[in-house]
Amino acid sequence: MKTREISRSLTNGVLETQRGGFSRRSVLALAGAVGAVAPFEFFGAARALTASGGGLLPHIAGAPRICRAAANGEELQGPRRQLKLAWNANSVCTAAAPVAKERGVFAKHNLDVEFVNFGGSTEQLLEAIATGKADAGIGMALRWLKPLEQGFDVRITAGVHGGCIRLLGSKAANIDSLESLRGKSIAISDQASPAKNFFLIALAKKGIDPVKEVEWRQYPANLLALAVEKGEAQALTDIDPLPYLWLKDGKLNEIATNLSGEFADRICCVLAIRGSLIRDELPVATALTRSVLEAGDRVARDPADAAAALSGYGGRGSVEEIAAMLRSHTHHNHPVGDALKKQILLYTDELKVVKVIKQSTDSTKFAERIYFDVLS
């Protein structure tokens, strides 16, 4: 059955249900449509019916309460649902997670979330989510897009914020712009880092070949500034908190961040959820996504309180320094839906230009495949 026919069958079945309850014809229409689609396709087709304001499940008498709750925007019912969320406790950009936990946002949405501080490779993290060792994770889009090409059963459900990637240049070497990096070396923490991937893109947009005209030298993250100080590199790029703290030494210029210029509205961090959780327990995935977005708004409104929540999990910097970092980010900016798919598409196109993503990848189809709307 084609998508258009599926949508027509679903629509007819629901309209009959709305007019007069269940009839034999409406039941057959709904059953036939549901049976013709894969799980994710069904969710997408059903969502198309909500455009006029109702949604599918709220109009069906006898639908499980947990499903009606999700469709109506109510809270999950019953005992709190236990979940495992993978994150990096040393990364300031994941502040929404501890805020959600410590300030009762997860509990408000009837979730009991356990943190898994993950230090392995991105592929290992995505595999952990896909196989159920964790239910979801918060991480960097520019680190995750390449591994997601491999087909992990993981879906991005929301952008979290932007602004945590910085490029710093040596004052002694007069590095104060992207153009001044032509023929220079940049210190990075790993060759697949989101910081490197972002500035590959930014340099290419300035007409600089980021592979042939710039050298990327790898060092342990905490030694990047030392490498610049010793002259082994003329610039460094990494993720807060370290770059922000190094700026205070006065030896480095902030050349750019991932909010500079045309990237002002881009996000860097995303929430991704296990595909089987979305298929089997969509209301849970919805509650988790809403919790993280609500916590992100709290971070934006009260960065000092967010810094206090985050500092309890370790990391670098005082509460005041962490709060200042959070103010420089865009924790109010967490796109979903078409806005987020557009950003994924743009990043994919840009990563293809710098040869991180395969040229054969269809950016539009890729964005559709790895994003799932759990909020509509």
Regions found by a protein language model. Give the residues of each.
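Conserved C-terminal helix/tail region of periplasmic/extracytoplasmic solute-binding proteins
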Residues: 351-376
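Short, glycine-/small- and polar/acidic-enriched structural segments
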Residues: 53-209, 217-218, 227, 234-240, ...
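Secondary-structure end/capping motifs
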Residues: 279-358
